Amino acid sequence: MDARTPEVPCGDLLQNAAENLLQEVEEHFQALTATLNLRMEEMGNRIEDLQRNVDDLMAQAGIENSIKEATT
């Protein structure tokens, strides 16, 4: 044993526990990130569908041209 680095019996256990905890946190964070990305993509798709439906309704109501003319 080296005199400059004393052995700590519980040091390895503590280090392993800390590494395991960090690994678990990282895995949970990655899962959360994936879930959030999926939900944001789904929300974007729903917004696009809603916009198409609104455009269709406006065209059916005959107000599409009047709104475009008012904004130009």
Swiss-Prot record:
Entry keyword Coiled coil: yes
Domain of life: Eukaryota
Cellular component GO terms, alphabetical: cytosol; nucleus
Pfam families linked: HSBP1
Keyword list, A-Z: Coiled coil
Key word Magnesium present: no
Designated name of the protein: Heat shock factor-binding protein 1-like protein 1
Name of encoding gene: Hsbp1l1
